[in-house]
Amino acid sequence: MTITLDGASLTLADIDAVARGGAKVAITGDADVLARVHGSRDVIARAVERGEEIYGVTTLFGGMADVHVTRDQLIDVQKIALWQHKSTTGPRLPDADVRAAMLLRANSLMRGASGVRIALIERLVAFLNAGASPQVYQRGSIGASGDLVPLTYIGASILGLSPEFLVDLDGETLDCHTVLAKLGFTPMDPDPKEGLALNNGTGACTGVAANVMARALDAATMALGVHALFAQALLATDQSFDPYIHAQKPHPGQVWSAARMAELLTGGRTIRSEAGGDRARRKGDLIQDRYGIRCLPQFFGPIVDGLSTAARQIETEANTANDNPLINPATGETFHTGNFLAQYTAIAMDSTRYLIGLMCKHIDSQIALMITPAFSNGLTPALVGNMDTGVNVGLKSLHIGMNQMSTQISYLGQSVADRFPTHAEMYNQNINSQAMNAANLARDQMDVTEHFLAAALLTGVQAVEVRSRVETGSCDARDILSPATVPLYEAARVAAAGRPDKARTIVWDDMDGFLQPKVEGLLADIGSRGNVHAALQALRSSLDTFRA
């Protein structure tokens, strides 16, 4: 698979394919696109020859933009644009995020508004295709004048600014000069504007955000699948998902969520088909399901709408020219701009984190019903498998751990974009997006969320197996589940502890084995996009095409 860069058509799926899937990258052969790239570079060259004043070319930067740069200093000032930002340390940015950042910077430069040589873009592409990842740090960017610090470590590495910039390649950590030589390049000086064009953009925070969105959409898909398992374990009615209800309140996400849940539950033996005329109630319980099921479309719908909006914003940002100044090669104009302000990325990440917190809290509240006999419609206390011993406690500790994770996930959902310092960079960056903080927190939240969902899937498997045993005498839940949820059940069951067993639930006697390896098996499958992901692929594809 090869992703072609033209500055305008990169999708979240493309970014995911390169960042996490290792897909190859190519520069478009479109003559118009290439003409814009070459043309913008020619505009800068002519402006320098004429002695025009251009920010960051013939001046210093930011709050020192009143300082003029002489002709013999033009190259040095571009080196300084990068050199001065090798200024951080701390935790490294994961390779997938570095790859996304390189891809987005290359794509942005392909718009032909940045005034750089095509050779710089070719180097970014060469690094990507070779699997060479500059060592970049999480800290240092406020997402205002772009991601100056993290993008510096990428830009300086592809230029070979100094051997102190390190690159990971084929399991080794090498200096950038060695890596350049391995790839057939030599160090090169930046031309006027090029140093600034490499680090003055939103590629780092938006690259992190793009990877987050892929995981967040996966998580939302899993969450809906988990709810479908829970609904069948709790003897839910399908009436809550009847299209008539949601036609009366036609928010796109609500309508989508109801339709998908209806599809997931169709044919389930424990689902009361009230929409089909079955009005019988179970064991004299409430005439209607509790809110967690009955209001699922109304609760989950805004999450779907919000994630769709965030995904669209990140995808748009990935196809922008976002450095300063920008050049119009058709007219020769240069524009002093603010496209480097990553506010859309910051807001999208703040929103995503908040929505993921709501999503996990909903799941946590449903599990509380399933483990509590007063609310579970006949499930065993704490979903104990073997009640005969009298000492098994089932999933009590697992749910306590999920309580902890749900709280952490919710805490990480607090906004960041509104907490910017007004004094940044000599008061020049007196508004700033904090997009890198927002995106890094979102990645951290997704780490916890995937762990939470692994535990939720284990709970769902145990719940439907307990229900199956109550209803049929067999612990193999395929006997009761809807056709649409059988693949998810099988995938989760195998990832956690092997094939379904008619005689024993996945957690039978507490001392048969620990819960930890079961959760780890599910988490590994989720992280590798294994069988659980494959089982939900149709649902994930539906979410990909959904538009709020």
Swiss-Prot record:
Active site: Y55 (proton donor/acceptor)
pH-activity note: Optimum pH is 9.5 for the ammonia elimination reaction from 3,4-dimethoxy-L-phenylalanine. Optimum pH is 9.0 for the ammonia addition reaction to 3,4-dimethoxy-(E)-cinnamate.
Annotated Pfam families: Lyase_aromatic
Binding site residues for (E)-cinnamate: N200, Q288, R294, N324, K396, E425, N428
Record note on temperature dependence: Is thermostable, showing a high melting temperature of 82 degrees Celsius.
Catalytic activity, reaction form: L-phenylalanine = (E)-cinnamate + NH4(+); L-tyrosine = (E)-4-coumarate + NH4(+); 3,4-dimethoxy-L-phenylalanine = 3,4-dimethoxy-(E)-cinnamate + NH4(+)
The keyword Phosphoprotein appears for this protein: no
Keyword Signal: no
EC assignment: 4.3.1.-
CDD domains: PAL-HAL (cd00332)
Principal EC category: lyase
Crosslink site: 5-imidazolinone (Ala-Gly): A144-G146
Gene3D superfamilies according to UniProt: Fumarase/aspartase (Central domain), Fumarase/aspartase (N-terminal domain)
Family, similarity comment: Belongs to the PAL/histidase family.
Protein name according to UniProt: Aromatic ammonia-lyase
Encoding gene per record: pal
